[in-house]
Amino acid sequence: VANTAILGYDLNKVYEGRGPLEAASIEYDMQPDDLALRCNIIELEDDCIKNHHGGHLTTEEGNMLIQSLNDKLGNEQIKFITGIQYRHLLVIKGGNKHITCAPPHDHPNEEWKSLLVQPEEGYHMKDDHRMSPQATANLLNELIIKSQTLLANHPFNLHRKAKANSIWPWSGGYRPSMSTLMQLYPEIKSGSVISAVDLIRGIGHYAGLDVIKVNGATGLADTNYEGKVKAAIEALEKQDFVYLHIEASDEAGHDGDLDLKLKTIENLDTRVVKTLYETISNWQEPVCIALL
């Protein structure tokens, strides 16, 4: 929501949830009847959400688990699609977006059964070709429960301390309709987005920005700060606009690690902002930096 609003979009007109934006980032071609949801792989312990990331899975590990789930639970209506790390995609053909899902990072140490998907209160069916909100919620909850059995018995989890033992679908929507930044702001002729996160890349895709991927950009505290700022400077030499996104402090905050969050903010200041400012200060053409 915040990243879309920062770029100047009217959220009431364009926002469809994280799922459709992340689908664009991984080049999944959403169809008009698709419901796309973010699908976290999370860790449950003692019937509670222990964390929202399954012990910080790598993309390779996440892909292995998602492909296994798709083999066992996927069909013509249901697709599990690999994203990045613990962040993946669940597509339901004919699914209804008028449901209430709990973001797992907002509910650590809470009982998962109390957070299951619910139909949106007060919504009256208008799309006869789609499932009802209740049927959609029932299907998603069934997938959550089935995933727990499959993941608990997956060889990957049998000898791993942190258990990636449940899916958690949320933030679903339909294919969005967004103008490009160039259409919103004629002064911008070209631009790029730099991020390790599918959500931000997806926003950039719909905004008409080039998506720049940086080696070593992890979205965590160990990300390649220098590589990202170097890519931003190189893009600014050729283009009018660069959206540089650093995820590390957000992940540290969700983990409740104050020391790490402070360190990531220091890294942002000394390894990104300082380098960027010192470089562009020597340019003849003025550059505006907005730090948000």
Which residues does each predicted region cover?
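Generic, well-ordered alpha-helical scaffold segments in large soluble proteins
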Residues: 146, 150-154, 202, 206, ...
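Beta-sheet entry/capping signal
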Residues: 89, 240-241, 286-289
